[in-house]
Amino acid sequence: MTTRALALRDALARLRDPGALEAFSAVAGEPLFAVELDGDPGDAAVPVALAQLAAPTVALVRDPEAPAARRFARHFDVVVASESELGCVDAAVRATPIASAVLAQLLRFGDPRTIEAGLIAESLAYSALQAGPEFRAWLAARPVSPAPRSASEAPLRVRRDGASLHLTLDRGAKRNAYSAALRDALVEALQLAASDDTIAQVVLDGAGPAFCAGGDLDEFGEAPDPATAHAIRTTRSAARLLASVRDRALVRVHGACVGAGIELAAFAGRVVAREDAWFQLPELSMGLIPGAGGTLSLPRRIGRQRTAWLALSGVRLDAATALRWRLVDAIE
């Protein structure tokens, strides 16, 4: 079944129905609320009603200058320009409706007062999904990796050059997948940067063909329980530390910049991409949401609707589009 965008008049009628909260939900009724914004703008109560829905809300906007679009589009979780884009979001939401709803609800909170508040909210939501059926199904379907792990590999190269601290992700054989060991090494290096005011610049890049291919999938599901996982994420947070040195941080990205790769990079004051860089948020397909700070760092750069589009659609974003959206600051 594919969601069809409701005409504005029909959508307004549905939103006035006291049963709308259950009619559009991941656990009852339709998992997506899609509306074509054309015609008379109508009811001013639309923004309030949209915020109450448990399902992601999508505005189909063919003409951005239409009165309804100008008045209401900003209140939806995602804005799409065509039926094909709507279909892309619809397929993702139907595959993992609970994770999709949690993402939309989290992004609706808007910009928190502090970095810590945003990271805690994201981690709590992420932990809830770690215990959910969609993530468990993804884990069960994933083949076990036969590759043994090397306990001796150094995941991060650290070099001091005058007033600059250079950090290089160095798991090239795994496309710099963000493992627990890499997180710990990055946290230690960023703690140094945060505590040493003689470090004028922190430069972060990656060795090998990719900046970072996202979380190390071989470690997914290894946390003893979701509560402990939340405690670990909020105790050892590279995102929080990178944000604390934001004004001194330069991140250079190339190749795959996936999941945690772009989530962390987006906290830096300046992100420079090579032309071959591409960006993706694949977590929804695993029954999760971005969990390395992305629900905080990306909206601050590109807004919540574009963040939701990236996460819900799973599309790859090229460097030119990333620059146009201001996800990166330059292409070199």
At which residue positions do the language-model features occur?
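Crotonase-fold acyl-CoA enzyme core
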Residues: 63-93, 243-332
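Short, active-site-adjacent cap segments at secondary-structure transitions
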Residues: 105, 209-212, 258
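A generic structural signal for short coil/turn motifs at secondary-structure boundaries
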Residues: 175-178
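Active-site-proximal gating segment of KS-fold condensing enzymes and close homologs
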Residues: 229-233
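Charged catalytic carboxylate motif
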Residues: 102, 181, 185, 234, ...
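Amphipathic alpha-helical segments at domain termini/boundaries
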Residues: 1-46, 52-166, 309-332
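A structural preference for short, pocket-lining loop segments at secondary-structure junctions
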Residues: 20-35, 56-58, 63, 162, ...
